[in-house]
From Swiss-Prot:
Gene that encodes it: ccmK1
BP terms from Gene Ontology: carbon fixation; photosynthesis
PROSITE patterns for this protein: BMC_1, BMC_2
Keywords: Bacterial microcompartment, Carbon dioxide fixation, Carboxysome, Photosynthesis
GO molecular function: identical protein binding; structural constituent of carboxysome shell
Function statement: One of the shell proteins of the carboxysome, a polyhedral inclusion where RuBisCO (ribulose bisphosphate carboxylase, rbcL-rbcS) is sequestered. Assembles into hexamers which make sheets that form the facets of the polyhedral carboxysome. The hexamer central pore probably regulates metabolite flux.
Record's protein name: Carboxysome shell protein CcmK1
Gene3D superfamilies membership: 3.30.70.1710
Family recorded in the similarity comment: Belongs to the bacterial microcompartments protein family. CcmK subfamily.
Superkingdom: Bacteria
Transmembrane segments: none
Length: 113
């Protein structure tokens, strides 16, 4: 199963919080982080199966419309990111989010019951 990366860039923090909430509620994805870009731009990043990430991004985009002044600036999905990206960009599963990955996918890291 390919683990995809999905991103939504919004204008304003409330919009990205709304997008992130909708994304993790709509599909079996894990929120791996967000990035403050500057000038009010914020990007939220999820990981999961390609079809789940697609559904997640679609839900996030739709829900940003609920935020007064919320605006989606860009979206993108990478179906199978090269492993080098995980070491350079903030898209990897961290220890802090691993518990959520387990609940979404049923995957348990080695050495954990």
């Amino acid at each position: 199963m390919a683990i995809a990366v999905g991103m939504i860039e919004t204008l304003g923090f409330p919009a990205v919080v709304e997008a992130a909430d909708a994304m993790v509620k709509a599909a079996r994805v894990t929120l791996v982080g967000y990035e403050k870009i500057g000038s009010g731009r914020v990007t939220v990043i999820v990981r999961g199966d390609v079809s789940e990430v697609q559904a997640s991004v679609a839900a996030g985009v739709e829900n940003v419309k609920r935020v007064n002044g919320g605006q989606v600036l860009s979206t993108h999905i990478i179906a199978r990111p090269h492993e080098n990206l995980e070491y350079v960009l903030p898209i990897r599963y961290t220890e802090a989010v691993e518990q959520f990955r387990e609940s979404v996918s049923g995957i348990r890291p080695m050495g954990r019951p």
